């Protein structure tokens, strides 16, 4: 009696695992897409750190939201939702060392890459943490997120 239920449960588990498990080619593609995303985030962090002290301290007064638990590619939607605000802050703090064309290009690259990574799924709703973070913390956390996802794909 229980044998049949156990076999059904095992079959269902195997079916779910097979459908949810990424293939090696999709893992390879995901890794390839994560690399430029990581580089663009690092470039933006470098831009933020390039600002003169007065600009940087003013920029750090702006706060950004992070998702409560970012563990999957779908959480990149939360990055996209805060990206426009980040671009505004970076453009406010323009200095001689910074190039707005590079910032805009990085923002566009991030948007395109995130769309490719998360797919066209738009129904995901971000649950944000109550605490806000600075631009530097925001970028560092997303860099760490990408590195974490990348390391799980290896």
Curated annotation (Swiss-Prot):
Record's subcellular location: Secreted
Glycosylated position list: 23
SMART domains: IL2 (SM00189)
Signal sequence range: 1-20
Keyword Glycoprotein: yes
GO terms of molecular function: cytokine activity; growth factor activity; interleukin-2 receptor binding
Main location: secreted
Keywords tagged on the record: Adaptive immunity, Cytokine, Disulfide bond, Glycoprotein, Growth factor, Immunity, Secreted, Signal
InterPro entries, per the entry: 4_helix_cytokine-like_core, IL-2, IL-2_CS
One Gene Ontology term from the biological process aspect of the record: positive regulation of isotype switching to IgG isotypes
Key word Glycoprotein present: yes
Disulfide topology: 78-126
Gene Ontology terms: cellular component: extracellular space
Function: Cytokine produced by activated CD4-positive helper T-cells and to a lesser extend activated CD8-positive T-cells and natural killer (NK) cells that plays pivotal roles in the immune response and tolerance. Binds to a receptor complex composed of either the high-affinity trimeric IL-2R (IL2RA/CD25, IL2RB/CD122 and IL2RG/CD132) or the low-affinity dimeric IL-2R (IL2RB and IL2RG). Interaction with the receptor leads to oligomerization and conformation changes in the IL-2R subunits resulting in downstream signaling starting with phosphorylation of JAK1 and JAK3.
Protein family according to the UniProt entry: Belongs to the IL-2 family.
Name used for this protein in its record: Interleukin-2
Chain's gene name: IL2
């Amino acid at each position: 009696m229980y044998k049949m239920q156990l076999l059904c449960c095992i079959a269902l588990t195997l079916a779910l695992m097979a459908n949810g498990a990424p293939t090696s080619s999709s893992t390879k593609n995901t890794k390839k897409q994560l690399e430029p995303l990581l580089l663009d985030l690092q470039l933006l962090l470098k831009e933020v750190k390039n600002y003169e002290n007065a600009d940087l301290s003013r920029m750090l007064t702006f706060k950004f939201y992070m998702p409560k638990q970012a563990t999957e590619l779908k959480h990149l939607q939360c990055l996209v939702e805060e990206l426009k605000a980040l671009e505004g802050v970076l453009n406010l703090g323009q200095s001689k060392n910074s190039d707005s064309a590079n910032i805009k290009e990085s923002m566009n690259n991030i948007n395109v890459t995130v769309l490719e990574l998360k797919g066209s799924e738009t129904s995901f709703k971000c649950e944000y943490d109550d605490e806000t973070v600075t631009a530097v913390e925001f970028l560092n956390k997303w860099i760490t997120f990408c590195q974490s996802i990348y390391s799980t794909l290896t």
